[in-house]
């Protein structure tokens, strides 16, 4: 796991995925400013998304192995993440699993429907591949889509960063709420604590660390 984290830090720092300045962001149904932002949208080339896919694949292999039927990438950011993870699982470990994703707008021509790719069936174990969880809103929008596929099980979700932020209920993170509400175990490549420790190693970020630490003390459960 340490190798996964180290590679993830170095790669994200190089690609400018860490943004360390005030960003207006929605959290737990409220808008607030955060001094840091992690954006997988800055992965813009084949090489970059391939590396990110390897980080997800390594985490999947380490935690659930082959014990799932298919992976689902929620629109929009989850689509390339699930695609990259599926390709990397096969290329790195010889594990070939189907994947699918949803459309934001249901298509009424061609193949039609709101899902693209694998068609889930009763008894399937689905894992979700997503960017981050902040308020858990995206998960709550995703679950009706998956449950609408039939009697499927969704036990695990994989994200790049656990921001460890409080959710709707005081004293609980959004990830804790997702686990209690849906029974989903969320696996993150890194946590905000990991990122904080990594950034402390570079003097470049000394000016932002106090604001980051204040934010974490106020909004995070560590």
Model-identified regions with their sequence ranges:
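PRPP-associated nucleotide enzymes
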Residues: 1-129, 134-222
């Amino acid at each position: 796991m340490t190798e996964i984290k180290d590679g993830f830090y170095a790669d994200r720092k190089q690609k400018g995925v860490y943004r360390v300045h005030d960003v207006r962001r929605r959290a737990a149904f409220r808008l607030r400013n955060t001094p840091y932002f992690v954006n997988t949208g800055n992965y813009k080339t084949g090489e970059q998304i391939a590396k990110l896919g390897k980080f997800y694949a390594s985490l999947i292999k380490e935690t659930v192995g082959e014990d799932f039927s298919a992976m689902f990438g929620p629109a929009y950011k989850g689509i390339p993440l699930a695609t990259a993870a599926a390709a990397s699982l096969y290329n790195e470990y010889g594990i070939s699993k189907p994947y699918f994703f949803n459309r934001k707008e249901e298509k009424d021509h061609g193949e039609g429907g709101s899902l693209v790719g694998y068609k889930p069936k009763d008894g399937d174990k689905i894992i979700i591949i997503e960017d981050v969880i902040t308020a858990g809103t995206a998960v709550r929008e995703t679950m009706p889509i998956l449950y609408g596929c039939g009697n499927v099980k969704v036990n695990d979700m994989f994200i790049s960063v656990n921001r460890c932020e409080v959710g709707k209920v005081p004293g609980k993170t959004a990830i804790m709420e997702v686990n209690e509400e849906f029974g989903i175990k969320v696996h993150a490549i890194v946590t905000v604590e990991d990122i904080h420790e990594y950034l402390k190693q570079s003097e470049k970020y000394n000016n932002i660390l106090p604001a980051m630490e204040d934010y974490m003390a106020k909004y995070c459960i560590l």
